[in-house]
Amino acid sequence: MPLLDSFKVDHTRMHAPAVRVAKTMTTPKGDTITVFDLRFCVPNKEILPGKGIHTLEHLFAGFMRDHLNGNGVEIIDISPMGCRTGFYMSLIGTPSEQQVADAWLASMQDVLNVKDQSKIPELNEYQCGTYQMHSLAEAQQIAQNVLARKVAVNKNEELTLDEGLLNA
C-alpha cells in the first residue's frame, strides 16, 4: 500500500493550532485544488473531544465558507481527522496560509456567538448520522482554545519525516 502524504510529515514537530498546505493538485480542466491541514491539537499530546469535534464539524463548515469563499476560492469539504487533532479542508483555489488562518479565527469567534444547541445546523435525525452526539459547550471550548493560542503556520519543509523513521 502506498504511503500517503499525511504520514510523511513528522507529527512530533507540528505546532497547534496551525495551518499547513497538505497537498495541491491540478485538475484536468486546470483548476487548482488545495488541501489544508487545520491542526487544532498538538499530535499525541492533545485530542478534540468527540461531541465537540462533531458539533464543530457542523458549525465550522459553514463559518469557514462565510469567511473564505470568493475571489477564486471555493471550499469543497471540511472534515475531521480520524486522529481527532484537526480537520482537513479541500478547496478550489490557492489562498495563502494567512488568509486561511484569518478565516479560521473569525470562524472560531462565530462558534462562540452561537447561543444554544438548537442553533447547530443540520442537528436532526434526517441530516446527521449521530444527531444526539453533540456538545455546543465542548465546541465553544475548542474555539476559545484556538482564539487564545492564535494560529501558526506549519511548513512542510520543516516537518519532513526522516527516511529512517518511515515505517519505524
UniProtKB/Swiss-Prot annotation:
<feature type="binding site">
    <location>
        <position position="58"/>
    </location>
    <ligand>
        <name>Fe cation</name>
    </ligand>
</feature>
<keyword id="KW-0479">Metal-binding</keyword>
<protein>
    <recommendedName>
        <fullName>S-ribosylhomocysteine lyase</fullName>
        <ecNumber>4.4.1.21</ecNumber>
    </recommendedName>
</protein>
<keyword id="KW-0408">Iron</keyword>
<dbReference type="GO" id="GO:0043768">
    <property type="term" value="F:S-ribosylhomocysteine lyase activity"/>
</dbReference>
<keyword id="KW-0071">Autoinducer synthesis</keyword>
<feature type="binding site">
    <location>
        <position position="54"/>
    </location>
    <ligand>
        <name>Fe cation</name>
    </ligand>
</feature>
<dbReference type="InterPro" id="IPR037005">
    <property type="entry name" value="LuxS_sf"/>
</dbReference>
<keyword id="KW-0456">Lyase</keyword>
<dbReference type="Pfam" id="PF02664">
    <property type="entry name" value="LuxS"/>
</dbReference>
<comment type="function">
    <text>Involved in the synthesis of autoinducer 2 (AI-2) which is secreted by bacteria and is used to communicate both the cell density and the metabolic potential of the environment. The regulation of gene expression in response to changes in cell density is called quorum sensing. Catalyzes the transformation of S-ribosylhomocysteine (RHC) to homocysteine (HC) and 4,5-dihydroxy-2,3-pentadione (DPD).</text>
</comment>
<dbReference type="GO" id="GO:0005829">
    <property type="term" value="C:cytosol"/>
</dbReference>
<dbReference type="GO" id="GO:0019284">
    <property type="term" value="P:L-methionine salvage from S-adenosylmethionine"/>
</dbReference>
<feature type="binding site">
    <location>
        <position position="128"/>
    </location>
    <ligand>
        <name>Fe cation</name>
    </ligand>
</feature>
<dbReference type="GO" id="GO:0009372">
    <property type="term" value="P:quorum sensing"/>
</dbReference>
<dbReference type="InterPro" id="IPR003815">
    <property type="entry name" value="S-ribosylhomocysteinase"/>
</dbReference>
<dbReference type="InterPro" id="IPR011249">
    <property type="entry name" value="Metalloenz_LuxS/M16"/>
</dbReference>
<dbReference type="GO" id="GO:0005506">
    <property type="term" value="F:iron ion binding"/>
</dbReference>
<comment type="similarity">
    <text>Belongs to the LuxS family.</text>
</comment>
<keyword id="KW-0673">Quorum sensing</keyword>
<comment type="subunit">
    <text>Homodimer.</text>
</comment>
